[in-house]
Amino acid sequence: MNPERFAVAPRRRWLGLAAAAALAAAATPWLAGCERGADRPALRGIDVTGAPYGRALSLTDQYGQRRTLQDFRGKVVMLYFGFVQCPDVCPTALARAVEVLQRLGPDAERVQLLFVTVDPERDTPALLRDYMAAFHPSFLGLTGTPEEIATAAREFKVYYAKVPTGSGYTMDHSAQTYLIDAQGRLRIVLKHERTADDYAHDIAWLLRGGA
């Protein structure tokens, strides 16, 4: 598997997925206030409030800046682990994140997507810059040494493994998304199968205080 072809050729596919997400979102706007009267609307993800994991993260973004969860206080963080050469699960997750931001409208400014690579060997900062930019200018790709990635994965109970292929290797990995509230606390885990509406629903709840 040639890493260079993921730096150029798939960009059209990434852009196509992002554009499709934006169009879908425009056609089905998210009404964030539809459940404001409820004390605690039923969450679409798994409530993990108070979990003894997912409390720390320290990696480097695609611009070379060290990032921790403290940097995003005041925002809800969508945290996802994946890799650039992922054929469909990762680009689908990122395209869905674009839809989520569209549904949230002005509140999207208080949401940050963090994409942690589980393939630091191939996912260089330059490649992460291209990959993130293909979806949304605010998305941040995080990388580090193999040891740092392993530490982050353990902290969030993420599984990943290198799987040999005939021409190189691919990565097997968990596909859930973690929602971290504006105080930097892990609150919700959303499965990959959930829709953009499900994600927007739970994020909107966290933006309203999550209580």
Predicted features and spans:
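Post-signal peptide N-terminal segment of mature Sec-exported envelope proteins
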Residues: 42-61
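A short beta-strand-turn-helix
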Residues: 58-77
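Short active-site neighborhood of thiol/selenol oxidoreductases, capturing the structured segment around
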Residues: 71-91
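Structural microenvironment flanking redox-active thiols in thiol-disulfide oxidoreductases
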Residues: 92-152
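N-terminal secretory signal peptides
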Residues: 1-29
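Thioredoxin-like thiol-disulfide oxidoreductase module
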Residues: 146-168
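Thiol-/selenol-based redox modules, centered on thioredoxin-like
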Residues: 166-211
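Bacterial signal peptide processing site
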Residues: 35-37
